[in-house]
């Protein structure tokens, strides 16, 4: 038994006798009733691909006043999903068939089409068959029977008109017959290989390979910025940038190594080393340290390996 869904506007809910009359008139169907406002508010949901017919009820008072009930886009999509393939969406009084119906475009955009009766039908795309398209292949040449008044060329026989006495007398000659050309025949042309591949390297010679690549100005990197490599770089730019970054990092690491002083760098640090002088060049040249600000000022020159102690109560002159 086919299933039928009735969508009633809220105005019909106040007239239960009208709803009973409508339901009894369609007793041959398995009927269900839903209120349009509850469906629009999302309080109820319709099962998918269930109903063969969805009937949109209209209150007669609304038609008299000219207030046509509207359906939102969400309600229309719910109705289309609830219809089975090939199911119909009908309305009382032929409302959907009227070109002045405001939701006519929305119904068509939802995937419904009009039939000859003005009802909306959900297309059954599953019933459509897929027809493969095949390319024509070379056919074997068959000997064509030719009459004495015909000419044969490339396996196609064309009957030629024969001049008669009536034509010589100025009267039109009756055409004996015309040959039909089979356009699906390849006329013994060599078959085409659809799988033939073209070698890209064969399209360029040595002169083309030696030409420099001209980079458009819009593709050049801006001043102070270097060009970035693509994510799937295949031109070698990513490897070159990686090598440059590795070299820069190695140079930076070498510059940040721990400072190491050799024996020739201890002139300012240890004055007990024999033959070493301070930056002023006066240390150990005389009999005492004389530089202003030197912590050893006034002391005699130190001997190599001598331990020097400065007491806080010593007066430095």
Curated annotation (Swiss-Prot):
Name recorded for this polypeptide: Fe-S cluster assembly protein DRE2
Region annotated N-terminal SAM-like domain, chain positions: 1-131
Function statement: Component of the cytosolic iron-sulfur (Fe-S) protein assembly (CIA) machinery required for the maturation of extramitochondrial Fe-S proteins. Part of an electron transfer chain functioning in an early step of cytosolic Fe-S biogenesis, facilitating the de novo assembly of a [4Fe-4S] cluster on the scaffold complex CFD1-NBP35. Electrons are transferred to DRE2 from NADPH via the FAD- and FMN-containing protein TAH18.
Gene: DRE2
Binding site for [4Fe-4S] cluster: 280, 283, 291, 294
Family: Belongs to the anamorsin family.
Any one GO cellular component localisation term in the record: mitochondrial intermembrane space
Pfam families reported in the protein's UniProt record: CIAPIN1, DRE2_N
Sample GO molecular function, one term: electron transfer activity
Region (Fe-S binding site A): 219-235
Subcellular locations according to the entry: Cytoplasm; Mitochondrion intermembrane space
Region feature Linker, mapped onto this chain: 132-209
Biological process according to GO: iron-sulfur cluster assembly
The protein's required cofactors: [2Fe-2S] cluster; [4Fe-4S] cluster
Motif (Cx2C motif 1): 280-283
Domain notes: The C-terminal domain binds 2 Fe-S clusters but is otherwise mostly in an intrinsically disordered conformation.
Assembly, per entry: Monomer. Interacts with TAH18. Interacts with MIA40.
Superkingdom of the organism of origin: Eukaryota
Positions of the UniProt region annotated as Fe-S binding site B: 280-294
């Amino acid at each position: 038994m086919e299933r039928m869904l009735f969508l009633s506007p809220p105005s019909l809910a106040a007239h239960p006798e009208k709803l009973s009359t409508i339901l009894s008139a369609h007793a041959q169907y398995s009927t269900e009733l839903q209120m349009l406002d509850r469906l629009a508010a999302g309080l109820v949901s319709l099962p998918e691909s269930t109903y063969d017919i969805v009937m949109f009820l209209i209150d007669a008072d609304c038609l008299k006043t000219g207030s046509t009930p509207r359906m939102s886009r969400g309600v229309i999509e719910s109705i289309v999903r609830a219809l089975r393939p090939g199911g119909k969406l009908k309305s009382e009084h032929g409302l959907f068939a009227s070109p002045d119906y405001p939701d006519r475009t929305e119904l068509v955009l939802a995937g419904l089409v009009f039939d000859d009766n003005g009802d909306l039908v959900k297309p059954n795309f599953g019933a459509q068959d897929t027809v493969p398209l095949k390319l024509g292949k070379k056919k074997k040449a068959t000997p064509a029977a030719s009459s004495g008044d015909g000419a044969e060329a490339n396996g196609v026989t064309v009957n030629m008109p024969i001049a008669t006495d009536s034509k010589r007398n100025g009267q039109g000659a009756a055409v004996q017959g015309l040959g039909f050309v089979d356009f699906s025949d390849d006329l013994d042309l060599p078959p085409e290989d659809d799988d033939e591949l073209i070698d890209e390297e064969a399209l360029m010679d040595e002169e083309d390979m030696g030409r420099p690549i001209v980079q458009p100005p819009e593709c050049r990197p801006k001043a102070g910025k270097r060009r970035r490599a693509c994510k799937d770089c295949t031109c070698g730019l990513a490897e070159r940038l990686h090598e440059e970054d590795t070299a820069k990092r190695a140079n930076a690491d070498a510059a940040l190594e721990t400072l190491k002083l050799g024996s020739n760098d201890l002139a300012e640090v240890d004055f007990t080393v024999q033959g070493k002088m301070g930056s002023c060049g006066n240390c150990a040249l005389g009999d005492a340290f004389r530089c202003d600000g030197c912590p050893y000022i006034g002391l005699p020159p130190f001997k190599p390996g001598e331990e020097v102690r400065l007491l806080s109560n010593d007066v430095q002159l």
